[in-house]
UniProtKB/Swiss-Prot annotation:
Signal peptide positions on this chain: none
Protein's organism: Streptomyces virginiae
Matches recorded under SUPFAM superfamilies: ACP-like (SSF47336)
Protein name: Monensin polyketide synthase acyl carrier protein
Claim: Transmembrane helix is one of the keywords in the record: no
Amino acid sequence: MSDRPFTLADLQRILVEAAGADESAGPDDILDTTFALLGYESLALLETGGCIEREIGISLDDDTLTDALTPRELIDHVNERLAAARVA
């Protein structure tokens, strides 16, 4: 499990690996843009979630992944799960 917060840079890297994200989009371009507008459907988010789980060693449920509307929401949820896992 990671001992540092999950960041937008982490998410962008994983999106590129898992779903072929546009690497040229900057943080200001995507943080609060919906995944739908960024071109990601639920299957791409589930694949991204699997990569996050393997990389940082936490469990994410499918509903959380598909309910996150923006990268900011997903990052916040991942960091909440990380914090909870560190305490447990």
